[in-house]
Every structure is written in C-alpha cells, then in structure tokens.
C-alpha cells in the first residue's frame, strides 16, 4: 500500500463535520463539499478551509475572496453528494433553499450553522490552498442534528444525553 493510500485510509477514521462551502461575487457563484474545515482561533473568529487547486471551483473562490461554510444537518446527504461531484453549479444550488449573508455568499437554509467569511490569507500546501477565513457573521439553527463523515460513510448525530459543564 502506498504512503498516500495509507494516509487516506487512516484519515477515513477521523470523523468530521460535513460542510458545503459556497461563494458568490465578481467571478460567479460556486460551491463544494468539504470536511477539511476547522476552527483556528476565536480572537478574531477564524476558520480554515482546505481547497484543492485542481478543483473546478478553485478559480472562483480565489477571485471572489469570500465564502460561507455551511455545516450540514442530518438529511442533507444527497445535497452533499451533489456538491461533491461533477453536477453543474446551477443544479447544485437549485436543490436547496439559500439566503444571503453579509458577504453575499449563499447560506443554506436548514444548515446546523453557517459561517459567512472573508478570506484573509491563502497558504499553499502541496496540491491545496489553506484558506484562513475571518468570520463576519454566524447563523445558527439549534433545531437540527449534525452530520459527520466517518469511515467513508455519513452518520447522523443526535442530541447528547449529557454534556460537560460550561
């Protein structure tokens, strides 16, 4: 087994939220499914998003300089598939309801949370760009259950029975 395949297999065991990352601006509207998204800091609120430079959406995200990370809820599996494949952009966005955040990037109605961001810095790493994104607006939906990708499958999350004290 190659080192690359061993790494991919190991990463399949690392559960992650499923997100649709969207943008709209001078270069047009685009979106893709991503699990390579995480918090960087809360001062100021910043996320990182990893985007393959060979992806068809890369030039649009690069030119627009803004995006929205929409964390998917249970029941969004088909939508994730649309945004993760070669489906034409119009069909992707036609499959759900959207609103606009402060940047104008599409925010998914029914998402667990949407982070509307301005891209502050781009760090190239091998085949990908790491986008450091300043969060400008957060829209939460506390009535939904999360969706994670683990072991190359979707898993719906339910509300915890108990949690840690704040």
UniProtKB/Swiss-Prot annotation:
Reaction catalyzed: FMNH2 + NAD(+) = FMN + NADH + 2 H(+)
- Please give the HAMAP family that the UniProt record associates with this protein: RutF (MF_00833)
- A molecular-function term among this protein's GO annotations: FMN reductase (NADH) activity
Q: Does the keyword Transmembrane helix apply?
A: no
Q: What is its EC number?
A: 1.5.1.42
Keyword check for Oxidoreductase: yes
Q: What's this protein's family per the entry?
A: Belongs to the non-flavoprotein flavin reductase family. RutF subfamily.
- UniProt lists the gene as rutF
GO biological process per UniProt: nitrogen utilization; uracil catabolic process
Which Pfam family, just one, is annotated for this protein? Flavin_Reduct
What does the UniProt keyword field contain?
Answer: Flavoprotein, FMN, NAD, Oxidoreductase
Q: Which InterPro entries match?
A: Flavin_Rdtase-like_dom, NADH-dep_flavin_reductase, RutF, Split_barrel_FMN-bd
Q: What is this protein called?
A: FMN reductase (NADH) RutF
Domain of life of the native organism: Bacteria
Q: What class of enzyme is it?
A: oxidoreductase
Query: Can you name the source organism?
Result: Cronobacter sakazakii (strain ATCC BAA-894) (Enterobacter sakazakii)
Q: What does this protein do?
A: Catalyzes the reduction of FMN to FMNH2 which is used to reduce pyrimidine by RutA via the Rut pathway.
